Amino acid sequence: LGDVYKRQVYEIMNSTLNDRITRFMVVVKDWDKIEQLGSIRSARPTNFMLAAEWNAVLCHDGGPFFINDWVAKDYSANFSGGFARYSNGKAAEFTEYITYDKYTNTQKGKTYDGLKQRFANSKYTTTYNDYYQGPHFKFADGEVTFDDRSDAISATTIELPFKHNGSTLKYNEETGTYDYYEYGSAHKDADS
């Protein structure tokens, strides 16, 4: 996920089974720049709650019966399934991706609508609707340090409680940001 359209990334525990496996959820502002984003997986109630906080349209591939109440909420906007299928050599559940415009899988000879077509054929707007609550976060204009605080603690390594993949954030002094690690190694995007 390149910096071109990255907005907010959540790592969410999807199940208390399977060693508390996690999935990523990305909130994208500049969705009209998406060439390929995914893979798209099934949703849980948490995905609907977070999408509503951002006044976003949730893109997912269905889910268990207990998401039905969330799909039915007035503020819930979502596109379920039918996204582009890429022939990438992976299992079927890892081949579904969001695109902005139509995509044709030349190996299968099938064309899939992108977000552009899906919005045009839906009741959803591409601008904020009546449920928009305003800006989500407020960040400092400049760097904030706690060097002058005697009670400050070091936060160079943050271990998140996800046993399955051992998610860890490690502070990178060169960039002044945290790098994400899982399974003991730095996680790199395709653009990295």
Regions found by a protein language model. Give the residues of each.
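A surface/extracellular/periplasmic glyco- and lipid-processing/surface-interacting theme
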Residues: 2-6, 10, 15-192
